[in-house]
Curated annotation (Swiss-Prot):
SUPFAM superfamilies: Sm-like ribonucleoproteins (SSF50182). This is Probable small nuclear ribonucleoprotein Sm D2. GO terms for molecular function: RNA binding. Residues 1-23 are annotated as: Disordered. The lineage of its organism: Eukaryota, Metazoa, Ecdysozoa, Arthropoda, Hexapoda. It comes from the Eukaryota. Residues 28-114 form the Sm domain. Interacts with the SMN complex. It is found in: Nucleus; Cytoplasm, Cytosol. Plays a role in pre-mRNA splicing as a core component of the spliceosomal U1, U2, U4 and U5 small nuclear ribonucleoproteins (snRNPs), the building blocks of the spliceosome. It comes from Drosophila melanogaster (Fruit fly). The gene is SmD2. It holds the Pfam family LSM. The keyword Ribonucleoprotein applies. Its main location: nucleus. The keyword Cell division does not apply.
């Protein structure tokens, strides 16, 4: 059984090796694979918007540089007086390059269409 040293006792080389291992096998492997294979991911954000795009870079805080992003959300249109039952309207916009701060990320999914096509 290998002894696990606390992070404070690791050399910079050991820290880098451990971080790379975590990025390749842990939850962040979804982002690692997206960067390596240039595949799309679907990101749910705290502002209740969804981002579908390609990850160019990321860090351990889930800060991301994204390209070719489609931002999607729903809005309730304003109603005049006396009108009822407003249907939500789906909206979207294209963003060619963006930086996404990690604290706004809730969930990251591999593109289900690309995953299904690969099977």
């Amino acid at each position: 059984m290998a002894l696990v040293k606390p992070k404070s006792e690791l050399t910079p080389e050991e820290l880098a090796r451990q971080e790379e291992e975590e990025f390749n096998t842990g939850p962040l492997s979804v982002l690692t694979q997206s960067v390596k294979n240039n595949t799309q991911v679907l990101i749910n954000c705290r502002n209740n918007k969804k981002l579908l795009g390609r990850v160019k870079a990321f860090d351990r805080h889930c800060n991301m540089v994204l390209e070719n992003v489609k931002e999607m959300w729903t809005e309730l249109p304003r109603t005049g007086k006396g009108k009822k039952k407003v249907k939500p309207v789906n909206k979207d916009r294209f963003i060619s390059k963006m930086f996404l701060r990690g604290d706004s990320v809730i969930l990251v999914l591999r593109n289900p269409l690309a995953t299904a096509a690969g099977k």
